[in-house]
A protein has these predicted regions:
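Short glycine-rich, flexible loops that bind phosphorylated cofactors or substrates
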Residues: 39-40, 155-158, 162
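Glycine-rich helix-loop-beta junction characteristic of Rossmann-like nucleotide cofactor-binding loops
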Residues: 75-78
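Redox-cofactor binding/interface segments in oxidoreductases and associated redox assembly factors
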Residues: 33, 149-150
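Short beta-strands and strand-loop turn motifs
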Residues: 2-6, 53-55, 88, 110-112, ...
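Conserved small/polar residues in nucleotide/adenosyl-binding loops
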Residues: 167-168
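Short, glycine/charged-enriched secondary-structure capping and boundary segments
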Residues: 17, 45-48, 67-69, 98-102, ...
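Glycine-rich phosphate/diphosphate-binding loop of Rossmann-like nucleotide-binding domains
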Residues: 80-144, 149
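Phosphate/diphosphate ligand-binding glycine-rich loop within oxidoreductases
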Residues: 1-73
Length: 168
């Protein structure tokens, strides 16, 4: 394993991601990246020749959700048919929980303020599914839930809104 921070790479200092992806592909067998922008992960995957694992972006947090789903399965022995409730803003965790939960046959219930809904593309995937429910009422969302998940009050990119979010 090799850890490289943004200080170790030239991406933020003008080097095109295409060049970085090609060079890293010569040295490594795979990359797990935690970054802010989803596009950075997609660009690495497009220009590199090795597997890219999304460790975290502003759009999704798939590794965390895989770990959460594994933990739920360890506790209940199954995922299909369980009701999972998420209470929080429609952030990367909400996006990943919606997709992961629905793809494993879970009922997914989300409570989030109207101004902080999940990504439109994720909503377009989820809304036709009868196992998906979204509301701004946490009590309705949590009703009969087997699992309730929450997240940080202020997500990546919302640092300026943190105080406001804590008091609404």
């Amino acid at each position: 394993a090799l850890f490289l921070s943004n200080r170790d790479l030239q991406i933020g200092r003008g080097e095109p991601v295409q060049d970085t992806a090609r060079v890293l592909s010569r040295y490594l067998d795979g990359i797990m990246i935690r970054t802010y922008e989803q596009k950075e992960v997609e660009d690495l995957a497009n220009y590199g020749s090795i597997p890219i694992i999304n460790g975290l972006t502003d759009f999704c947090h798939p590794c965390q959700v895989l770990a959460d789903l594994m933990t739920i399965r360890e506790k209940f022995a199954v995922l299909e048919g369980l009701k999972m409730c998420y209470i929080g803003d429609g952030n990367n965790m909400a996006n990943s929980l919606i997709v992961g939960g629905l793809k494993t046959g879970m009922k997914v219930s989300i409570a989030t303020p109207a101004d902080y809904r999940p990504d439109a593309e994720v909503m377009a995937f989820a809304e036709p599914n009868p196992n998906f429910f979204i509301t701004d009422d946490p009590m309705k969302a949590a009703e009969n839930a087997d699992v309730v998940i929450t997240d940080t009050w202020a997500s990546m990119g919302q640092e300026a809104e943190k105080d406001c979010l804590l008091y609404t």
